């Protein structure tokens, strides 16, 4: 202990900044010197379900260092006090807060965590993460977050229709956006994401959400992930020329999304019901830069989709297939389809495909025929892995 106490205050503060806030606070009992060191830690994490810890930090927080880089708060309905969030937020924002995360998951609609209005005009805020239906996003008209680069909204409540459009329009440097809607998000009718600077976008939409179209205009996007469980897929997505990677999980009607992600190098697909028809698929959808394709098999006639993708991915190098263990066939397999397929061998099989992985293989006729076709036609194949 004597050797540690001999270190300068700056180094001691750096050391205790790597431990949980509760542990950092407990060091205040070690000696007179240690009594105030934790107050200079720039990152705070507080579980507000522990009244003693909450009260101690709130009592001492006004004396905190000039800058609070990160604040992480966790609330529960039974221990939530409305004045807490106002006090926490006000103090943190006045100390040049850069990162804020609030978790408040509750099975009840009320009470809501109402964020202080000053949060929506915080010039220093770079990262904002709000998780839980207990949090209500009430965006004021004067919202302005000039430094915000990362925004996560997971299952939060919204005060009025279309608050997201207002919020996003006032984040001029936003780069990373995650939106996860919940069954209770009735105020979000049409999801509109128009952010010229956005580079990463993740959307999760449950089946119970509105079937209204959502609009995405993100010309600088590099990574796109969408999980849409609605039966009716309805979206307008403008061209994303910078896109490098996409993860798509939909129930059906995947064509619109595929048309928007043709520039990707890595593509992951999961479609619950197969709606692709090789004779009706939109012309001109070619994945010229696609090198790695990962496909989850969970629908009948999945080979139609795979072959179509192979035919339109001339430079594909890696193919990963994963058969869903819960997948059950509802239609009779038509083996005659392979006669037509083998007349036109995809270009990637002749010149670029080097790796094949097939997980969840069960030796069904369609699987056997597909693998037989690949092994016969893939001239450049170097490695393959087949597993149950």
Swiss-Prot record:
Residues 337-388 form the FBD domain. SUPFAM superfamilies: F-box domain (SSF81383), RNI-like (SSF52047). Gene3D superfamilies: 1.20.1280.50, Ribonuclease Inhibitor. It holds the Pfam family LRR_At5g56370. It comes from the Eukaryota. Coiled coil: none annotated. Residues 1-47 form the F-box domain. CDD domains: F-box_AtFBL13-like. InterPro entries: F-box-like_dom_sf, F-box_AtFBL13-like, F-box_dom, FBD, FBL13/AtMIF1-like, LRR_dom_sf, LRR_FXL15/At3g58940/PEG3-like. SMART domains: FBOX (SM00256). This is FBD-associated F-box protein At5g60610. It comes from Arabidopsis thaliana.
């Amino acid at each position: 202990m004597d050797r540690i106490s001999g270190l300068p205050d700056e180094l001691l503060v750096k050391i205790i900044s790597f431990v949980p806030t509760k542990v950092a606070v407990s060091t205040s009992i070690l000696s007179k010197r240690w009594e105030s060191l934790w107050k200079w830690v720039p990152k705070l994490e507080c579980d507000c379900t522990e009244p003693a810890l909450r009260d101690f930090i709130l009592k001492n927080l006004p004396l905190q260092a000039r800058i609070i880089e990160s604040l992480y708060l966790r609330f529960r309905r039974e221990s939530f006090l409305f004045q807490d969030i106002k006090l926490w937020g006000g103090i943190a924002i006045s100390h040049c807060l850069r990162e804020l995360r609030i978790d408040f998951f509750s099975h009840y609609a009320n009470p809501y965590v109402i964020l202080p209005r000053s949060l929506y005009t915080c010039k220093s805020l770079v990262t904002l993460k709000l998780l839980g239906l207990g949090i209500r996003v009430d965006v004021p008209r004067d919202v302005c977050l000039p430094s915000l680069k990362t925004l996560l909204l997971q299952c939060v409540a919204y005060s009025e229709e279309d608050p997201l459009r207002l919020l996003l329009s006032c984040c001029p440097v936003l780069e990373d956006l995650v939106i996860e809607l919940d069954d209770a998000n009735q105020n979000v009718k049409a999801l509109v994401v128009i952010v010229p600077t956005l580079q990463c976008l993740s959307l999760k939409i449950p089946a119970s959400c509105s079937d209204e179209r959502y609009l995405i205009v993100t010309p600088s996007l590099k990574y796109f992930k969408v999980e849409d469980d609605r039966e009716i897929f309805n979206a307008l997505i403008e061209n994303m020329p910078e896109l490098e990677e996409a993860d798509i999980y939909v129930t059906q009607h995947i064509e619109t999304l595929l048309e928007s992600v043709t520039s990707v190098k890595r593509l992951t697909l999961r479609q619950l019901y197969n709606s692709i028809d090789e004779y009706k698929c939109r012309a001109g959808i070619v994945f010229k830069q696609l090198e790695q394709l990962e496909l989850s098999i969970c629908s009948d006639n999945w080979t139609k989709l795979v072959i179509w993708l192979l035919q339109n991915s001339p430079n594909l190098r890696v193919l990963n297939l994963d058969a869903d263990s819960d997948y059950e066939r509802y239609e009779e397999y038509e083996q005659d389809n392979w006669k037509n397929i083998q007349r036109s061998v995809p270009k990637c099989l002749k010149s670029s495909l080097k790796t094949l992985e097939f997980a969840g293989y069960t030796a069904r006729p369609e699987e056997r025929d597909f693998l037989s076709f690949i092994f016969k036609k893939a001239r450049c194949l170097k490695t393959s892995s087949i597993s149950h």
